[in-house]
Amino acid sequence: MLTRAALIIMAWVAPISAHEMTPAYPKIKPSYVSGVVKVEMSIFNYRSDVKYYQINVFDAAWNSVPFSTQYKVLKVKHSERNNFDVYLRKADLKRAVYLCTTSKVKKQVGVKTLVSSRICSRLNGNKP
């Protein structure tokens, strides 16, 4: 019975689309500022109900790691791609594990909360 319920839930959830962020394991590149590195990323929006995505960097325990980017919240229209750069201090690079984008669902009166999605890329490669 439990397996059947799990299959029904998976079939119901499967059509829900999220967003895509590439690459999954980005290359760390030097930036034009000494002591700072750059990560080049790209995001594609599959969701017609979401236009904004927040960028975050986390350590292995999901604590925030300081970073800089042109916009901490990106506007990405439906079926469009947006390229962005994230800058980290070399001193924080060993701590930084995940670079994530989270969909920002617009709050509306009288409308039930929609699903928010978070996609993460791993900054330290395949290291555990």
Located regions from the model:
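Terminal connector regions
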Residues: 91-128
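Asparagine-centered strand-capping/turn motif at beta-strand->loop junctions
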Residues: 42-49
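Sec-dependent signal peptide recognition
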Residues: 1-9
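Intrinsically disordered, low-complexity Pro/Gly/Ser/Thr-rich segments with frequent PxxP/GP/PP motifs
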Residues: 65-93
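Beta-sheet-dominated interaction scaffolds and their linkers
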Residues: 17-40
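N-terminal signal peptide c-region/cleavage motif recognized by signal peptidases
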Residues: 13-15
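Exposed beta-strand and adjacent loop surfaces of beta-rich binding modules
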Residues: 38, 50-54, 96
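Short beta-strand and strand-turn-strand segments in soluble, beta-rich domains
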Residues: 50-54, 58-72
